[in-house]
Amino acid sequence: PGVLTHPLRGDEPDIASLAIPQVGRGNRLEVIAKAVEQVVNRIGDQVWVYACMGGPWSQAVELRGFEDLIADLYVDKSRVHALMDKTAELAVQHADRLCRLGAGVYLYESWATMPLIDPKIFEEFVVPYNRRVTQHVRAKYDVPPPAIIMGGNITLLMDYFVQAGTGLIACDYNADFDFVRSRTAGRSIVVRGCVDPKAIERGAWESLESAIGKLAAKSKGM
C-alpha cells in the first residue's frame, strides 16, 4: 500500500511526534545489529570493522525530502534544527548499539556533498550534529575512529570535517590532495583515496591501473 499520511508532509511538519525507532524482533535494526555482531566475531581481531548508517543530515533529507528541507532553511531554521536533533539522537542511539558490539561507525552524508548544499549550510547543519555523534563514540568506546563519508570533491569542506571530529574521510581523485594533506597533518585522520568510478565501470585494467598509480602518487605521505 502507498503512504497516505506522513508527519513531515506538507508546510507544517509535525516533528515533535516523531519517535526514535528501537530494536524490535525481526526489524531492520535487529538485522543490522546481528549482522555486525557476526562480522566482528569472525574477523574483528584481525581488521577494523565498520558499521554504516546515514548521517543526521542525510536522515533528515530522507524523512523530509530534499526540496522541502532546503525550503525550510529559508522559511524557519528552527524547524530544521528540531529535525536534526531527532536524527542526531537516532544516530547516537544506533552508534551505541553497534559500538557495544565492537564496531566503528561510518556516517554516510551523501546528501551533504557539494554542490547539493553550500559550505555555510554544511557548517551550520552538518558539522554540529555529526560532531555530537563522533564525540559520543570517542568518549564511550574503544573502537575504530568514527568516519564521516561522502562523495565528490571535499577540498572546500576539509576544515569542517576536522571540526566535526571525523577520524576517516573519503578523498575523491579530483580533490586537492596537497590541501587535504595540510589540513590532516598532525591529526589522527585516515584518508581513504578513491579513484574515478567511471574508470571501474569501463573495466579497462590499463586505465584503471594508471588511475590507481596517479592516486597513490598524489596521496604519498598521508
Give the positions of each predicted feature:
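A contiguous, low-structure linker/loop signature
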Residues: 1-22, 38-41, 45-46
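Active-site loop segments of alpha/beta catalytic cores
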Residues: 23-222
